[in-house]
Amino acid sequence: MRFEEWVKDKHIPFKLNHPDDNYDDFKPLRKIIGDTRVVALGENSHFIKEFFLLRHTLLRFFIEDLGFTTFAFEFGFAEGQIINNWIHGQGTDDEIGRFLKHFYYPEELKTTFLWLREYNKAAKEKITFLGIDIPRNGGSYLPNMEIVHDFFRTADKEALHIIDDAFNIAKKIDYFSTSQAALNLHELTDSEKCRLTSQLARVKVRLEAMAPIHIEKYGIDKYETILHYANGMIYLDYNIQAMSGFISGGGMQGDMGAKDKYMADSVLWHLKNPQSEQKVIVVAHNAHIQKTPILYDGFLSCLPMGQRLKNAIGDDYMSLGITSYSGHTAALYPEVDTKYGFRVDNFQLQEPNEGSVEKAISGCGVTNSFVFFRNIPEDLQSIPNMIRFDSIYMKAELEKAFDGIFQIEKSSVSEVVYE
């Protein structure tokens, strides 16, 4: 049997609904998801309006019907705590715009956060929001550093000079994305770069050296949270320098996996919470949630978060990618004189490449469909071997990289990018 014939028989069709409409189309996913503890929902490009709409409906279904209790997002770990407090009732409804002003976050995401805030007002089981990423999209040390600095000021004044020194250097790199920080890394001297890296490592080691005292005084949860903030600064530091290497043409294989290691650790850190059995929805780019290495023309770009979560928790992790057949997508290019350190082109999609999952699913005559890969027949022929990444196609063994794919017929870039 060919892949196209199998898809015709096995696909689950759905409609892209208004955020308040029902999610009946997705109820066949109950058996597929089962007791899976961590389910990741992807996107083949950032800033796509329809992907946010689809994930909003899926989020409601996962929470209301399947009992998921945590929404984990490709968003700064420290900044995420502010939004978590907000969805639990702090502040006013309109503050959400202020929390999202540091990036191209569309209205559809605000709608999701407002829904979570309203849901938590009456829910017995409150929903947690978890930012899993390095600080401020990889552009600034400060969201994490300010918290760790405050901790040292109270808990370890003797070592405060270490983080003071790091802070004085780090505040010169206060941007909104990894590419923006990398493009402006020249603002630090080579000596400052080395000193910052060294002092960040000393901050972490000092926390670990003093762990018994901190745990006794503040508790294990507080200590491990502060340590995770410190790790976020270290991974961000590495990630900025790795991106600088890629932009200059000298990047090492696998280097961009630093961010993915931290995101995977953030999810696993949350799963260790002894207070409840968490079921987590993770939302991030397809390239972060997939379970196999990211390769560009044979070059190993990244060992992704999804691969690490699969290795850590096995079949308790499920990766569901999202892509589109036609319309427009966001193509991103590092560029120094832009708002967030990259140019976003509103790229017109052409006919999908032969061998792509987009071409194969649309070739079956189905649109807006979900295809599940876990029980795919071993003798199935013509399985697609590539998927779109932003405006290009990337080789992947689809049935190993993802447990399933949602494909929508037409995508568009959110208006927020061009405001």
Swiss-Prot record:
Gene3D superfamilies: Biosynthetic Protein domain (1.20.1440.30), EreA-like (biosynthetic domain) (3.40.1660.10), EreA-like, domain 2 (3.30.1870.10). It is an enzyme of class 3 (hydrolase). GO terms for molecular function: carboxylic ester hydrolase activity. One of its GO terms (biological process) is response to antibiotic. The keyword Metal-binding does not apply. Its EC number is 3.1.1.-. InterPro entries: Emycin_Estase (IPR007815), Emycin_Estase_proteobac (IPR016273), Hydrolase/PRTase-associated (IPR052036). Transmembrane segments: none annotated. Erythromycin esterase type I and type II share no significant homology except for the region from 279 to 309. This is Erythromycin esterase type II. It comes from Escherichia coli. The lineage of its organism: Bacteria, Pseudomonadati, Pseudomonadota, Gammaproteobacteria, Enterobacterales. The gene is ereB.
